[in-house]
Amino acid sequence: MDSLYNTYLKMLTTPFDDPSSDLPDISPEDYPALFALADRHCTLPFVLPYFRNTGLYSQILQKSKHMMLNYYQIDQFTRRTVSLLKKHGITCFVMKGISLAASYPVPEYRKLGDLDLYINDKKDFQRAEQILHKNGYLDEEEPCDHHTTYRYTFEKTGRSFLLELHYRVVGVYQYKPANPVSYTHLRAHETSAHL
């Protein structure tokens, strides 16, 4: 592993409250490459303090703010969608994305792209599809063997988000044994983080 990557990893593992501790000196010409690494790995908010006195600081700050805004918008989308299904007696489980945010030092730093919900019961899944259609969720064409995709656009902002409604945990060719998940097993491991 090269020294630049080691510096990047050190930036990620150094406590936020002491960004100067044990970091090697960073030469000015290394900052663009460190920025590119953090951007590629969606970790810009974590390295922001180290760029405070550089010309890249405002760009990283702006991208970090955008990530955090996106987090709150997807959080709102998640709450809206789960509440809608719950109101109709449909139990669903949040997968990946926002459900992992609690594992981060700052939950808002978790980069999010869409909402993944899993519905174990086939009849509930079919009902959910009808409910979503009636409430403005539009089909989004995507070839997939384990979920259907919907696009929802908030009227006030015009911002749209994708929902992947899973009827299997993973694709049949990814890891088939993961799919026969029982409702009892899901209930035993259900968490209410962020919802």
Placement of each model-derived feature along the sequence:
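Conserved NTP-donor binding/palm subdomain of two-metal-ion nucleotidyltransferases/polymerases, i.e.
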Residues: 1-113, 119-187, 192
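Cytosolic catalytic cores of cyclic-nucleotide second-messenger enzymes
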Residues: 195
